[in-house]
Amino acid sequence: MKTSTSILRACTFILLSAAALACRAETGVRVLNDDAHYPEGPIWYQGKLYYVEYDRNAVMTWDGKKNSVFSSDKGCGQSAVVPTVHGEFLTTCYDNGTIGRMAADGKVLPPYTHDKDGNKFTGPNDFAPDSRGGIYFTASGTPPDALDGKVFYIAADGSIALKAGDLHNANGIAVSKDGKILYVVETNENRLLKFRIGPDGSLSDRQLFVNLDDLTHHVVHIYPDGVKIDSRGEIYIGQSARETNVPLAGVIFIVNAVGVLLRQLTLPSLQVPNFAFSPDEKTLYVTAVDQIDKSPFLGKVYSIPNR
């Protein structure tokens, strides 16, 4: 997809130029946790940042001063956390194929193990709550190629139904502010899809929203990961670089509602898989990974000025 240079308000993608290299990191970056073990899936809720540490099998909180363990669930392999309308929390348990449940105090509750038709969840990954009290989530699919990714929907009454399949490593997911569009990342295809959301939560009219190869005009895939949408409808796309020398490592891409690149944010880490907004959206909380080749997948949690 072609972009206008007039709207690239941060760095342009002339990545080998001196100007681009000088723009490798944003100002005002703050480290909130410098010993995170594969941090992922954050959300701001009731005055705290909730996020997971996959390699610690833990849900963490940051209250503005310190990081604390909120809940642990050995074998889960948490990838994201989200509150429900019933005062519980859910986690995507990537390793054991369940949707973990926690009480408001962090106590582990019996998990969701399948949908209403008996479909299992292979590699649960990320959440997207809607305005009806329901929550969409992705199931990445069977490694290594993950060609059987899916999207499920947890209704407010706790029932779970399959809504979309045939996704190639389904990953980040987000609902548009008007509740009419669902965006889904296909990491292995380096693209972001969109679906029309029906009144009953059904998905239809599957379309390509943006191909990241076209967006970046670079030969190396960025492997898109998490996706979030702000109050202006701007779409933030994280990424998980799979090589250590990728020029676009640490970059969050921000596009408008038609997929045109607006700007980028750059963090001093290799992977920036996911993020969450502060209530006023002036701060972006970013989970990042520096050690991508082996456990404990050391990373950081950052805050960065937004806009």
Regions found by a protein language model. Name each.
Residues 56-58, 96-97, 142-144, 189-191, ...:
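Short glycine/acidic-enriched loop and turn motifs that connect beta-strands
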Residues 58-60, 98-100, 149-152, 191-193, ...:
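A short loop-to-beta-strand structural motif that recurs across blades of beta-propeller domains
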